[in-house]
């Protein structure tokens, strides 16, 4: 058998299927698009869901890819097993309504065994099929000519892909026999038939025959269109072709492991021989190396795709991977930040297929280093906590173990090892139960549904073609109604109801690419209809949701009128989105990545990834850059070309994992903005008119949402509204000030108020009025304190002559009952009296209209015998409620 590098394996796979008329799908981001059911892209087929469920038409019915994916549901197994990873790469070939079982099996067999491709010995391949799938069994036996003792007919548990509802079907798996050396107990093929975990028979390919639909009650019906979904793990293939004990000795991970050895100053070494001659200590060392090599690869890709360490969702996963790696690095004697030094090793091994990693190197290194340095402080606290637990308890409880695991990043194995050194046990079973409860809560919250929606037969059969003409027009006469339906039922006529309509040609823009749908009217001599919404169908048809007045019929000719004002303002905002995207990348750097946007007639927002919140100065600089481009009156240019040409010739940016057609549309403004975009735009930047950033907010770790407005009208309305809000807030402050002005005057406060009152409304002054209002608030806060102090001092004047008397214990005591002091006044009076007299107990009670307040204070010299809180709790004749300490206690009272 050939010895192949990972890059060679991937290339042979893709070249083979491309030669078999499969369309190559570029790998997409690990962040799912428009799929809230997934936290990560977790399989090769996850990115193809819209094609399989009929929402979108694929570029070809035959597809192939090599897709990176992440799964972290059992992260604790990484480094322990031979083939478990957080991030992995899935090789796939897919048929959507094209070939089915026979050709899928034939293609797999040819790629695996033909000497021009993988050239694997046929006698080393074993097959499993679903025991009721006679067709697949016969194809393997009669067409491929596999020996019957190499085919296993297994149960639904192992060979039927079904997630409870939606498309499903039997699957066939292909295993490679690595030989008896990997089967120490000489069990043989029963390892396959009994589904026993082993390192001899490695599953290399899984082919799912998606031919049924499960209605959710285990009632199965044939799908109108049958599909093929296959997956083969690249890491497993690499282990086979490079003949390594586990995936970690392949060219994917081993260079990183060798780099980690260097970072330990070669005090710790990874041992390949440990697989055959296991040693407990060396196994633990190997595990540390494997965890680090696995986790750093996943982390590099995740950050490059726009996920930054954080406290929830994807960000928390990456934070946990970094922390887990730090803990294992600590076991290898690495006490300082080191993971960021491995980034180069990962990129070097992966850059051939993922060249974009090179540009992300600095960002990834800095992000990881910052996170490591923060965690190393936490890790030290974790060790201190565990040491304290060991000193004070005989057992590390399940809750303590979980706290160390989740909050301090301690693997349970490390907690056990450290505890065992002091003969302290760990409640392992309790920990496992708590951990599973935590995982289940997460699963319930996210409901990571793998099932796809039941195929919409109406949509999958919807083959009518429609042309969008709205890039160049906002009205069209004599558009023809070519399809109508309601509630998934096709209709030929509708009266005074809502209906979905497809026209042969339409100027109405369908919501997509972050741009809101057009609205407007359709009409002819017999009817009128209001276009409420427009969405895109599976073959890019614009599907209009229309409220019909009178009667609309199939084949009617109608006139279309797009709401012109809405379209114009939406265009300004969409072009404004491109402008601010350019400006942020110019100011902050190319590591800024757009991850989504939305623009309609009211404004625009854009989500982008960056490792920190931009400063106000940076945002102002970006805003001014946009205004400069508007002032320069730059023409828009539009190009239609291939995806490759759009990037190479036009330097077009294509972010947030959108899937593109073979021919794409490029929107360019000068030489500074070039993006793939299907939306509507202004012809010249001057048509945007005006621009202002209205806010920015965090949407999670490393993800920010910026909000902006365009046009003279919208910006002026916003400025008038904001200035009114700020001036009204200043009025509230000055009105309160005027009530106390006779008691205490503040010229600075009055002058700043006048500045706010008389400020001119414009963009430049927006930041100024915010700053002035902040100053006014600060001055007012200080002013309020001084006024309150004056008021309190005036109220306390009548108590200046209070003198102590001896209580029953012969101790100086002042006890006062009054009706005009609040709790703040009582505390101030207590402090004044203690400062005036030595060795004093103060008991002050005030009954106001609303509350009965009490304060007890004791001089420090008496606190060894008398404590304020004790006197407070045991005051004769009163029931008290509150709190305090030896020095002072406060609260409320009721007379008994």
UniProtKB/Swiss-Prot annotation:
Pfam families: DHHA1, tRNA-synt_2c, tRNA_SAD. The keyword Ligase applies. Its main location: cytoplasm. One of its GO terms (molecular function) is zinc ion binding. SUPFAM superfamilies: Class II aaRS and biotin synthetases, Putative anticodon-binding domain of alanyl-tRNA synthetase (AlaRS), ThrRS/AlaRS common domain, Translation proteins. Binds 1 zinc ion per subunit. This is Alanine--tRNA ligase. It comes from Mycoplasma capricolum subsp. capricolum (strain California kid / ATCC 27343 / NCTC 10154). The lineage of its organism: Bacteria, Bacillati, Mycoplasmatota, Mollicutes, Mycoplasmataceae.
């Amino acid at each position: 058998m050939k010895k192949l590098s990972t890059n060679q394996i991937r290339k042979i796979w893709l070249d083979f299927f491309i030669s078999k008329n499969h369309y190559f799908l570029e790998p997409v981001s690990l962040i799912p698009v428009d799929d809230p059911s997934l936290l990560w892209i977790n399989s090769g087929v996850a990115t193809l869901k819209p094609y399989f469920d009929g929402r979108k038409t694929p570029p070809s019915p035959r597809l192939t890819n090599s897709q990176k994916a992440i799964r972290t549901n059992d992260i604790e197994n990484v480094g322990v097993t031979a083939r478990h990873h957080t991030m992995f790469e899935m090789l796939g070939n897919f048929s959507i309504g094209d070939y089915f079982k026979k050709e899928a099996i034939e293609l797999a067999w040819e790629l695996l065994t033909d000497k021009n491709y993988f050239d694997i010995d046929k006698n080393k391949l074993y097959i499993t099929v679903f025991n009721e799938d006679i067709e697949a069994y016969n194809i393997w036996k009669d067409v491929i000519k596999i020996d019957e003792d190499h085919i296993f007919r297994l149960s639904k548990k192992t060979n039927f892909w079904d997630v409870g509802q939606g498309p499903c079907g039997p699957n066939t798996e292909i295993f490679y026999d690595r030989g008896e050396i990997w089967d120490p107990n000489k069990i043989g093929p029963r390892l396959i038939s009994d589904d026993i975990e082993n390192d001899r028979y490695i599953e290399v390919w899984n082919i799912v025959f998606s031919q049924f639909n499960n209605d959710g009650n285990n009632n199965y019906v044939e799908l109108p269109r049958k599909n093929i979904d296959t997956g083969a793990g690249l890491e497993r293939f690499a282990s086979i072709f490079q003949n390594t004990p586990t995936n970690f000795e392949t060219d994917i991970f081993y260079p990183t492991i060798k780099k980690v050895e260097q970072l330990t100053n070669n005090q710790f070494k990874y041992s390949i021989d440990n697989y055959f001659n296991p040693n407990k200590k060396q196994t633990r060392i190997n595990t540390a190396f494997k965890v680090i090599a696995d986790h750093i690869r996943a982390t590099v890709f995740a950050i490059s795709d726009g996920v930054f360490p954080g406290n929830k969702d994807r960000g928390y996963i990456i934070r946990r991977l970094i922390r887990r790696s730090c803990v294992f690095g600590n076991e290898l004697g690495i006490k300082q930040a080191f993971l960021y030094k491995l980034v180069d090793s990962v990129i070097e091994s992966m850059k051939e297929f993922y060249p974009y990693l090179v540009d992300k190197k600095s960002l990834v290194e800095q992000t990881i280093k910052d996170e490591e340095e923060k965690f190393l402080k936490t890790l030290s606290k974790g060790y201190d906590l565990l040491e304290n637990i060991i000193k004070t308890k005989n057992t590390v409880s399940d809750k303590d173990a979980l706290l160390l695991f989740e909050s301090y990043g301690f693997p349970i194995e490390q907690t056990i090892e450290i505890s065992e050194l002091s003969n302290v046990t760990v409640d392992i079973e309790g920990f496992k139960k708590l951990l599973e409860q935590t995982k289940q809560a997460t699963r319930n919250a996210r409901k990571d549904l793998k099932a796809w929606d039941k195929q919409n037969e109406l949509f999958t059969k919807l083959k009518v073609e429609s042309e969008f003409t709205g890039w160049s027009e906002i009205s069209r006469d004599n558009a023809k109604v070519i399809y109508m339906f309601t509630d998934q039922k096709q209709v030929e006529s509708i009266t005074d109801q809502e209906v979905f309509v497809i026209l042969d040609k339409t100027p109405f823009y369908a919501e997509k690419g972050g741009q809101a749908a057009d609205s407007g009217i359709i009409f002819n001599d017999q009817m009128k209809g209001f276009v409420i919404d427009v969405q895109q169908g599976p073959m890019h048809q614009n599907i209009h949701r229309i409220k019909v007045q009178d009667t609309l019929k199939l084949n009617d000719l109608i006139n279309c009128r797009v709401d012109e004002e809405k379209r114009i303002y939406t265009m300004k905002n969409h072009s404004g989105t491109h402008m601010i995207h350019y400006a942020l990348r110019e100011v902050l750097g190319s590591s800024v990545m757009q991850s989504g946007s939305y623009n309609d007639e009211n404004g625009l927002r854009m989500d982008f990834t960056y490792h920190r919140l931009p400063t106000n100065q940076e945002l102002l600089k970006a805003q001014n850059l946009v205004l400069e481009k508007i002032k320069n009156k730059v023409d828009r240019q539009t190009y239609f070309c291939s995806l490759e040409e759009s990037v190479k010739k036009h330097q077009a940016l294509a972010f947030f994992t959108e899937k593109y057609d073979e021919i794409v549309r490029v929107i360019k403004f000068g030489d500074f903005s070039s993006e793939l975009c299907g939306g509507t735009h202004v012809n010249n930047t001057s048509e945007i008119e005006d621009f202002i950033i209205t806010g920015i907010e965090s949407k999670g770790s490393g993800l920010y949402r910026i909000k902006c407005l365009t046009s003279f009208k919208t910006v002026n309305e916003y400025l008038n509204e904001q200035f009114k809000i700020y001036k009204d807030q200043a009025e509230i402050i000055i009105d309160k000030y005027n009530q106390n002005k006779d008691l205490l005057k503040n010229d600075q406060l009055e002058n700043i108020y006048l500045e706010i009152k008389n400020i001119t409304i414009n963009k430049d002054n927006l930041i100024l009025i915010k700053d002035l209002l902040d100053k006014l608030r600060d001055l007012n806060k200080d002013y309020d304190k001084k006024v309150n102090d004056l008021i309190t001092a005036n109220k306390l004047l009548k108590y200046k002559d209070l003198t102590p008397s001896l209580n029953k214990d012969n101790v100086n005591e002042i006890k006062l009952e009054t009706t005009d002091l609040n709790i703040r006044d009582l505390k101030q009076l207590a402090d004044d009296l203690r400062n005036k007299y030595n060795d004093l107990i103060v008991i002050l009670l005030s009954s106001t209209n609303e509350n009965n307040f009490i304060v007890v204070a004791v001089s420090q010299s008496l606190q060894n015998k008398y404590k304020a809180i004790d006197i407070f709790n045991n005051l004769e004749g009163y029931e008290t409620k509150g709190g305090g300490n030896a020095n002072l206690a406060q609260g409320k009272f009721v007379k008994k």
